[in-house]
């Protein structure tokens, strides 16, 4: 069963990700949610998960004897016109003696329950780990040191610095990303510069759709806080936040397209992969303080080196060529498209809006059967869906073996 020995393969995310921050609490709260994020089936009616290793998520707070529990199926639905629509199941992990099946002993047969245990676990014991209160604690990222679920399932990489006010869109950890095949797959999937930028832009768009909404007041605060702490809100131009683009001095990055689109321009996300963190700026830079009549000026000089062996080296060079001192220019592939013949004809006296061809009305699709569309979501289903923070397949930027490592967005 799932409690067998590891086969040598692993579904664990890339080992370059260093896990810091809080660990799962040792004692549970009054909530009844899983401490960990879910694994999700890729298709409807998928069989129950099988694990290459023990199937128990990593938790350094627990002894080996306590590393046992169960995965429980959670049916999922999303609202649709006239009712709800089923989506692939999610499976949540609970320690033995906790969660919705707290009354079961390890190994008891029940539909929608898969028991798992690490080697050396005392499956006769019951856990005091408790469950999670979603109002107080975020889901803890899944990590499997000895192998994850089979290829019918996926889970999303959650960075530990994710706040409660927003949701992260990051790399999906799935069976296809196993360690032995990672090096080969990186090279095959590195893609062209156009694909890289398109995927980067898609990440930003998805993050805006699924994340918490930014109010006008919040956007204004983001754009007008202390200059060195500003970020560009959605819908803002670069020069609205950081001033006009220039040449040969501070503020010289960004062409006209980037200035107009702001963070929607995928090149912004691509280049942020090379920008140092605040700690790197402070401790890895040459810092030069200088007293001026208006105050203290801090000059921070930092150099990021992108190896010529980096799969994205040419792409970064191209973006720099376009955007450094790029004011007044646009990418060659961003020339305005000529208007169609029908729309470019000069207006005449005989022209009238009434003569324009009306778009054909879409035929109404027949209503789905009762087994596909049911009533509105129940309160229990809404609660269950509330902890499903990643319903859609994430959009992944494959940076390859970049100079700074993987998954740095």
Swiss-Prot record:
Protein name listed in UniProt: Nucleoprotein
Region Dimerization: start-end pairs: 226-333
CoV N CTD domain ranges (all copies): 215-331
Low complexity bias locations: 15-31, 164-179, 341-358
Region (RNA-binding): 29-160
Entry-linked Pfam families: CoV_nucleocap
Gene that encodes the chain: N
GO molecular function: RNA binding
Subcellular location, principal: virion
CDD domains assigned to the protein according to its UniProt record, in alphabetical order: CoV_N-CTD, CoV_N-NTD
Free-text description of this protein's post-translational modifications in UniProt: ADP-ribosylated. The ADP-ribosylation is retained in the virion during infection.
Start and end residues of each stretch annotated as Disordered: 1-32, 44-69, 121-145, 164-195, 238-259, 326-409
Compartments where located: Virion; Host endoplasmic reticulum-Golgi intermediate compartment; Host Golgi apparatus
GO cellular component terms, A-Z: host cell endoplasmic reticulum-Golgi intermediate compartment; host cell Golgi apparatus; ribonucleoprotein complex; viral nucleocapsid
Domain CoV N NTD, chain residue ranges per copy: 31-156
């Amino acid at each position: 069963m799932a409690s067998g020995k590891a086969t040598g393969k692993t579904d664990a995310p890339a080992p370059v990700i260093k896990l810091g921050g809080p660990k799962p609490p040792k004692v549970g709260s009054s909530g009844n949610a899983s401490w960990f994020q879910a694994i999700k089936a890729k298709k409807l009616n998928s069989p129950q998960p099988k694990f290459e290793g023990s199937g128990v998520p990593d938790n350094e707070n627990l002894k080996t004897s306590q590393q046992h529990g169960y995965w429980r199926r959670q049916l999922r639905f999303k609202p649709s016109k006239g009712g709800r629509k089923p989506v692939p199941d999610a499976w949540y992990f609970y320690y033995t003696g906790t969660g919705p099946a707290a009354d079961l002993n390890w190994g008891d047969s029940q539909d929608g329950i898969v028991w798992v245990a690490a080697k050396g676990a005392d499956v006769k014991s019951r856990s005091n780990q408790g469950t999670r209160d979603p109002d107080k604690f975020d889901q803890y990222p899944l990590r499997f040191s000895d192998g994850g679920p089979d290829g019918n399932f996926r889970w999303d990489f959650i960075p530990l610095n994710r706040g409660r006010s927003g949701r992260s869109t990051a790399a999906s950890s799935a069976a296809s990303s196993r360690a032995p095949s990672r090096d080969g797959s990186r090279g095959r999937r590195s893609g062209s510069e156009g694909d890289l930028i398109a995927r980067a832009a898609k990440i930003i768009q998805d993050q805006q759709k699924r994340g918490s909404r930014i109010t006008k007041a919040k956007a204004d605060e983001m754009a007008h806080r202390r200059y060195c702490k500003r970020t560009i809100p959605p819908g803002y131009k670069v020069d609205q936040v950081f001033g006009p683009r220039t040449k040969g001095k501070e503020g010289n990055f960004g062409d006209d397209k980037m200035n107009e689109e702001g963070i929607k321009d995928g090149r912004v996300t691509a280049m942020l992969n090379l920008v140092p963190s605040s700690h790197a700026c402070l401790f890895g830079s040459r810092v030069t303080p200088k007293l001026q009549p208006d105050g203290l000026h801090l000059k921070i000089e930092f150099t990021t080196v992108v190896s010529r062996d980096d799969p994205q080296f040419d792409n970064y060079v191209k973006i720099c060529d376009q955007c450094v001192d790029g004011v007044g220019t646009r990418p060659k592939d961003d020339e305005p498209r000529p208007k169609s013949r029908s729309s470019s004809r000069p207006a005449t006296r005989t022209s009238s809006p009434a003569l324009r061809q009306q778009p054909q009305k879409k035929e109404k699709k027949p209503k789905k059967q009762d087994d596909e569309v049911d009533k509105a979501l129940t309160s229990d289903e809404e609660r269950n869906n509330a902890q499903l923070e990643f319903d859609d397949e994430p959009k992944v930027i494959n940076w390859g073996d970049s100079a700074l490592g993987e998954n740095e967005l």
